[in-house]
Amino acid sequence: MEEFKRYLELDRSQQHDFVYPLIFQEYIYALAHDHGLNRSILLENTGYDNKSSLLIVKRLITQMYQRNHLIFCANDFNQNPFFGHNTNVYSQMVLEGFAVLVEIPFSLRLISSLKGKEIVKSHNLRSIHSIFPFLEDKFSHLNYVLDILIPHSIHLEVLVQTLRYWVKDVSSLHLLRFFLHEYRNWNSLITPKKSSFSFSKRNQRLVLFLYNSHVCEYESIFVFXRXQSSHLRSISSGTFLERIYFYGKIEHFVEVFTKDFKAILWLFKDPFMHYVRYQGKFLLASKGTSLLMNKWKYYLVNFWQCYFYMWSQPGRIHRNHLSNHSLDFLGYLSSVRLNPSIVRSQMLENSFLIGNAIKKYDPIVPIIPLMGSLSKAKFCNVLGHPISKPVWSDLSDSDIIDRFGRIYRNLSHYYSGSSKKMSLYRIKYILRLSCARTLARKHKSTVRAFLKRLGSGLLEEFFTEEEQVFSLTFPKASFTSRGLYRRRIWYLDIICINDLANH
């Protein structure tokens, strides 16, 4: 980072956060292309056609301001070289470079805040499965959870105002406004169910940065409350005095909110509040009562509407009791169930049976949604009956078997954390029979005749490596088939949810 800072010559302008002049520097676009300082890689790329030069960038900026961008029509929008499906090399360069520029103030502040601190680097925290051990440890002690969909109708000016606290460069903010107003369907980028993006895939870096910075703004209140309340377990006198001061600040903070909400919200005194977010959805769990969770729901709706001008319908926030409802989160149906156990106690000549119920976090495989995904991907019909995959009939037999087997192995790998993996047998049956029907269709034969001729060993790709994992992890233990499917394993190398539509 020091080399990066020196190369960008930010020392003279860092105090004002002036990043706009850097858009005329050619090496910015090399950074945007390969995330390094090697310009030769950029010039060797045929997609840029060896036209990356300072003169071209300056000429492009000049042409941008010579056009009148305040008047739009449908044809102009479709033909705009900056957006749409036009692969104009200059527009790609400017957008990629600007995405790097707006990240610079955040990166420099992060590096300066970490000086003198020893940071433990762990790539395992990038895994989606790293969330579930946390839920397993915490949720079994909690009562209620708010299942919340983050509002996605963000006003364009709100995004710009969010960056004003970090980037004081007015010219950069004007350029950001230009990009955002050119793209009039901005909200579809962050709507989970919409996939028709007008931005090029190369420019999603800017989109994700703006969205995450915006979410970080209203997410900070949870981080603040949790970071302060997490020290309550400490018993030192200094920490005790710090807690008194902290609660004094909270009471003052709540009194300030009284002016807007006409009620005192004693929400931030709950030391058992836990927060988890992934993409456009987050969970807020607490050991408190139903009344407390209703107050949180009321607070969030008003907070988004009053301070971020985002309309959030109360129906997007669901309050559930963990013992009675299942949460659809990260592809699992999670719940907290009571696990009864009976202990026999012997005292002299008398014996007693003591019943005890322990709360246990239980993630299960959502078999019905999975079958719906298989039906959408044309592996089975809506009733779950396997069908052939005609679009793969032109592939070789080994490629067909490998594709079907890879889909099942990925699903089995992702749902290894469930204690009820026996339900995956239905998915395995659908994929195996769909594979057999695809091969039979290719060879113009029936499934029975095809398998009889080649043998059942043809579909060995569908046998997972779970047994090998257990034998390596527990070499001295022996597991039955039933015990194998009840054991939970959380893998720390999964960085995305398996999408059946993109196999």
Curated annotation (Swiss-Prot):
Q: Which UniProt keywords apply?
A: Chloroplast, mRNA processing, Plastid, RNA-binding, tRNA processing
Transmembrane as a keyword?
no
The record ties this protein, via Pfam families, to:
Intron_maturas2, MatK_N
Q: Which GO terms describe its molecular function?
A: RNA binding
The chain's coiled-coil residues are: none
Give the UniProt record's GO annotations in the biological process aspect.
Answer: mRNA processing; RNA splicing; tRNA processing
Compartments (UniProt record): Plastid, Chloroplast
Query: Which function does this protein serve?
Result: Usually encoded in the trnK tRNA gene intron. Probably assists in splicing its own and other chloroplast group II introns.
| Family annotation (HAMAP family) | MatK
PANTHER family for this protein: MATURASE K (PTHR34811:SF1)
Per the record, the similarity remark reads:
Belongs to the intron maturase 2 family. MatK subfamily.
Name of the protein this chain belongs to: Maturase K
